[in-house]
Amino acid sequence: MTIKSDKWIKKMSQEYNMIEPFEAGQIKVSNNQKIVSYGTSSYGYDVRCADEFKIFTNINSSIVDPKNFNDKNFVDFKGDVCIIPPNSFALARTVEKFKIPRDTLVVCLGKSTYARCGIIVNVTPLEPEWEGYVTLEFSNTTPLPAKIYANEGVAQMLFFQSDEECETSYADKGGKYQGQVGVTLPKC
């Protein structure tokens, strides 16, 4: 597997709609103000999070069980800035919709701007032929509230292309997160 360059990312997005909406360059300013950058980088694509969030809460004092997840553990929030409580986390989704080629695997890494503030992003790999909006998990590892900015860069996607197509893709398996649209909670 080799990491793919900006040229490949641009071609696949413009000709095959791999990323929509797609930004061919790096956007660092919006409305004459500096923002956390998003768009195509040398060997990746910096995604934005949309303005819809699910913020983790302990109001119900329940146990977090991935096999039987209680959606009441989250508070829905819509806005330009999400404040994550100390030592807690929030879910969001990308602005961009992805359509991953059959011979490609995508790995997500956090942006240093957030990591240096104690905010960690976690996303499992985007598997071959997975399609949809990516659900993002932000962990606030600090003892203080932390901000996430909607419609600005939050994570970088790295694209790895195999020398051969996989035998069974995510679409072939009928993956449970295929085609997700909004912030998607755990499914078991």
From Swiss-Prot:
Pfam families: DCD
Domain of life (superkingdom): Bacteria
EC supergroup of this enzyme: hydrolase
Single GO MF annotation: dCTP deaminase activity
Keywords associated with the record: Hydrolase, Nucleotide metabolism, Nucleotide-binding
Pathway this chain belongs to: Pyrimidine metabolism; dUMP biosynthesis; dUMP from dCTP (dUTP route): step 1/2
Annotated active site: 137 (proton donor/acceptor)
Keyword Hydrolase set for record: yes
Record: residues binding dCTP: 111-116, 135-137, 156, 170, 180
Reactions catalysed, as given in the entry: dCTP + H2O + H(+) = dUTP + NH4(+)
UniProt-listed Enzyme Commission number(s): 3.5.4.13
One GO term (biological process): dUMP biosynthetic process
Similarity field: Belongs to the dCTP deaminase family.
NCBIfam families registered for this protein in UniProt: dCTP_deam
Assembly description: Homotrimer.
Role according to the record: Catalyzes the deamination of dCTP to dUTP.
Listed name of the protein: dCTP deaminase
Organism of origin: Francisella philomiragia subsp. philomiragia (strain ATCC 25017 / CCUG 19701 / FSC 153 / O#319-036)
